[in-house]
Structures are given as C-alpha cells and as structure tokens.
Amino acid sequence: MPVSTLQQEIRRRRTFAIISHPDAGKTTLTEKLLWFGGAIQMAGAVRARKASRHATSDWMELEKQRGISVTSSVMQFPYRNDGGDYIVNLLDTPGHEDFSEDTYRTLTAVDSAVMVIDSVNGVEAQTIKLLNVCRLRSTPILTFINKLDREGRAPIELLDEIENVLQIQCAPMTWPIGMGKSFRGVYHLVNDTVQLFDPKAETEKGATAGMIQGLDNPELDRVLGSQAEELRIDIELVRGASHTFDKDLFLAGKQCPVYFGSAVNNFGVQSLLDALVGLSPEPLARATQTREVAPLEDKFTGFVFKIQANMDPKHRDRIAFVRVCSGRFERGMKLLQVSTGKTVAINNAITFMAQDRNTTEEAYAGDIIGVPNHGTIRLGDAFTEGEPLRFTGIPSFAPEYFRRARLNNPLKTKQLQKGLQQLAEEGATQMFRPLASNDLVLGAVGTLQFDVVAHRLEYEYGVDAIFEPHECATARWLKGKPEDIDKLIDKAGHNVAVDGAGDYVYLAPSQVNLRLTQERFPDIQFMETREVV
C-alpha cells in the first residue's frame, strides 16, 4: 500500500477511553458522543428508571440489570467537522472500582482519555486511581465537567481541586454561565463566543439556543441580563489566574483542557468531540521488549489487551480485542501469534459498535479488531507479520479477595471448570488450582467480581455455583530457579497453586506467613504484579 494512503488513514484515527467515578455521567456521555458521531439514532435517557432501552455500550445482561458498566466496550464511528474526516475508536471502561484491572488494561490500548467530573461531587476516589494509571503512561487527558444543569460547586473551586488532588494543570477552554436552574450556556475562551443553553433546543444535532459573538456584544446583556456582567468579571479572573492551553504540555499528560456541559442535555458534547479529534494525538508508537513500533511501519503488528467470553451467548464465543499498533490489517492475512510461534489466517475479525459487529475487511494503526478465540489466545499476546515482538506494559495484578467454587450439582464439574477457565481468560478474575487439593479457587481485585462470575456461570454456562470464603489472604507469583521452587513446593506445597497460564502461585494464608516464607526462600521472587507477555 502506498505510504501516503497508509499515512492518511492512520492520521485520521483517534483512539480514546472515557474514565470517571461511577455515576459521574460517563455512560450518558458515551452515548451522546455516539449520537453526535451518527453511530446511533437517538440520544435518549440512558438507563432512566422507566426507560425500556439500555445504554448502547452496556450490553451484558448483568450490566443491564445493575446499571453499572462491568466490561470495556469498544465502539468505532466516523466523525466529520470543519477540521477534517476522522475515524473515532471509543473505549468505554467500567467505572465501578471492582473492575479497575480491566480498565487498567484498556488504558494500555488508547492514545488519549476523557476524564468526566461530576460538578456536584468534584474529584472522587475512582477518578484519582484512573488518572494515576493514565499518568504512568503520560496519556493526554481532556476533562469534561458534567451536570452543569444541576446546582453544583463553583467552577473555579472544581479547577483548584483537579489541580491540587490530581496534580495536573487545568486550561479552561469553555466557562459556564450560571448553573442549575440559572445555567444559561458557556463562553468559549478560544474564539470569544457565547453558546446559549436551552434544554428544549438541544434535541437535534448542532441545534443550540443561539450563539453570540464577542464578550462585549450588547446582545449579551439583552439575553443574559445581570449574568452578562458576572460573566465578564469571571472571564477576566479566569484569564488572569488560570493556565492558557499549551499543546506540548497536553500531549505530555501534564495539562488538561477543560470543557463544561450537560451530557444528558447534549450540551457541550459536540465541543468536546471537536476538541478530541482536533487536539488528541493520532496513533502513538508502542514499546516492545526489543524496540519501539511506529504506527506508520508498513507491516502489521498488534497486541491483545482484553478477552471477552460470550459476547453473543447464542454462539458461546470468545473474542480477543486487538489494538492495531502499526500498518494495515487485511481480511484473510496470515499472522504470527508470537506466544505460540504459529501462523494463523485471520479470516473473520470483527469491528464493534458495542454488541453490533461487522466483519473487518481492513483496519489501521489505532483501530481495535476482535479476533475469534478458541482458547489459544491470551492477554498480552502479540500478532505480527513474522517479527517475534512482545509488547510491554500490559499488567496482571495479584488478587485481593479469594473464594472457593462449590457446585450444587456435582455432575456439572466439567462445565464449571470450562466456565471459570474462560471467564478467567478475560483477566478480571484469576483461577487457581491448589497442588494439594481438587479445589477451584477464584481470585479477584474486588468482591463484586464473584457476583458477576456466579451470574455469568448461571446465565451463560447453565452452572449453579456458590462461592465460599477461602483461607487465603494474598497471592504472589513465584519467580526463580526450578530447583528453588521445587524446594518451596516440598516444604509448603499446601499453599502453592497453579494459575490459568500454568505458572506457580503462592497463596498465603496471612501476611505474616508470606513474610516468613519470603525470608525462608530468599532466592525466590514473590511478585505482586507481573506483565502479561
């Protein structure tokens, strides 16, 4: 393929995730972005109490029942504005804290992120965790302060909190005029324009209650009354006291442009989307153990950042989500699966619009494709046109909670093993088989995961399982010479298990036991996290 065409296609890609604390409005914003992008027909009330439809990105049965996002959905849509023609890849991540591991891995597959802040609650615990994950990779962040149609905290106070708590500079790009019942719109600092808000006018794309050019325009006083003068004072203060936007600082992950709006009313969403495609980076280079992979290389490379079982329960399928890192994917191309050394023909890769899928004819760096997986593809696997690359930075965490699986019907043991194995391959839970028993022990980073697994076992595999507490306080992967690990198994084999990848894990009954065991076996590394490579 000519370099210019490859370059053109890659340069129009934007791949980002939305991060927030639960209930900040992330799912609503996701749906409104899809609506502005033309990917869905209506932007209705997402998960409203009486609504019969569910958010486009919350497709799993349990998510529909509970109203929280528990898996990362991937959605692709085209978007065109005055600046050009773009392909947007939006990764919706779980907001609930028990799903941080899945979110962490999803953030390895994006080039930028939108952070949603609730104007009523400000910076919350999960936002802090997720921003710290983005900071590890210097991911550029855009901030959307949501729910301006409610009585919230003062905008200047919110910016101060973001800067102090999250340690990132804020550069306001829009500024709200009032809030709650007196919310009248936003002022665009970059082009000196007031965009007026009227909830009745915001039902069509591009519709607005009106635009007024210039802060000194007398029309502003006529429309806003006393709020016009308040706005002028606010803007003078903001221009003097806050940071002006610096693209280099933004791309380095040190400054975030800030937009205000009300996602539920479609207000401010299009400005955010325009900023996202205009300011965010095109696909970035990715690190491997041997070299950096540049997106414009002509040979295809990609890595698996997520595995999802039963995206379509009718087909009992498993899909490996692959981030394309370089070159172009073509349907039917033969690729090396680096971990197995085998070459596979990828004939039926798919692209996503939440649960709607289409067969992928081609994809470029920045895109996410789904590769059907029959149990041979693992998290972190690399696919290339022959080069034995291993991408770095895809983490797996030691679980903090443990349960033993028990069946109500012992005849379903085979289905239980298969279900737990497949669900563990997704990486949100981990399955351990203790060497000293036939137990199946499940580990997770949060207790909600066990409810999710029990529900999915019943709904997707027809298995009724109970999860009982297990006498394990923490887990550590074992790394060392085979003879040293054999000695540990000889002395403390009752606490050693094998994980889904066949690696040895020490299941410590207490922190004291772990410390004493580490002292007794100083030549073995007891690892809390490890990279999936």
UniProtKB/Swiss-Prot annotation:
tr-type G domain boundaries: 11-284
GO molecular-function terms, A-Z: GTP binding; GTPase activity; translation release factor activity, codon nonspecific; translation release factor activity, codon specific
Pfam families found in the cross-reference section: EF-G_D2, GTP_EFTU, RF3_C
The entry's keywords: Cytoplasm, GTP-binding, Nucleotide-binding, Plasmid, Protein biosynthesis
UniProt superkingdom: Bacteria
Keyword field contains Nucleotide-binding: yes
Binding, GTP: 20-27, 92-96, 146-149
GO biological process: regulation of translational termination
Coiled coil: none
Cellular component aspect of the GO annotation: cytosol
Keyword Nucleotide-binding: yes
Localisation: Cytoplasm
Similarity comment: Belongs to the TRAFAC class translation factor GTPase superfamily. Classic translation factor GTPase family. PrfC subfamily.
NCBIfam families: prfC, PRK00741.1, small_GTP
HAMAP family from the UniProt entry: Rel_fac_3 (MF_00072)
Chain's role: Increases the formation of ribosomal termination complexes and stimulates activities of RF-1 and RF-2. It binds guanine nucleotides and has strong preference for UGA stop codons. It may interact directly with the ribosome. The stimulation of RF-1 and RF-2 is significantly reduced by GTP and GDP, but not by GMP.
Name listed for the protein in its UniProt record: Peptide chain release factor 3
Organism: Ralstonia nicotianae (strain ATCC BAA-1114 / GMI1000) (Ralstonia solanacearum)
